[in-house]
Amino acid sequence: MIKIIKLVAVFFISITLINSALAESSFFEEGKIKYNEKKYEESKFLFQRSIIFNPKDQYSYLYLAKIYKFEDNKREEQKNINTVLLLDPQNEEANYLLMEIELKKSNYSKVKELVENFTKICKKLCDKKPLILESLKNLEPKNES
């Protein structure tokens, strides 16, 4: 009798774990679909739910940052980008988005540091590097002596 109870308990625990894993995945996938349909409020909610199930889901944070960029909520955008970079410092898209933010702030030293890092990690967005370098030249402090 005890063996049957243990077996049933293991079965229910297994089902619960499988369901939570599937729910996490489905929230992200559904959020991505809504994002591509430009339904940002719905996708934001789904990405936030995905993060509840998996707080280390860097892609949900990245999509949230993009949504906040669209909404012009700079504070939340930067917070989510920083979270992505904390989870994966090699994420080139997050690095690029952070460079854009720092360029707008005219933070020359931070952009220069990010460009060096971006050069090492870029795979897909390497074509954006000349744009950043050109913007960096415009920011470069002038030595007026």
Residue locations for each model-derived region?
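Register position in tetratricopeptide repeats
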Residues: 36-37, 70-71, 104, 138-142
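Terminal, low-structured helical/coil segments at or just beyond the last alpha-helical repeat
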Residues: 112-145
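Canonical tetratricopeptide repeat
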Residues: 63, 97, 131-135
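Canonical positions in the second alpha-helix
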Residues: 49-50, 83-84, 117-118
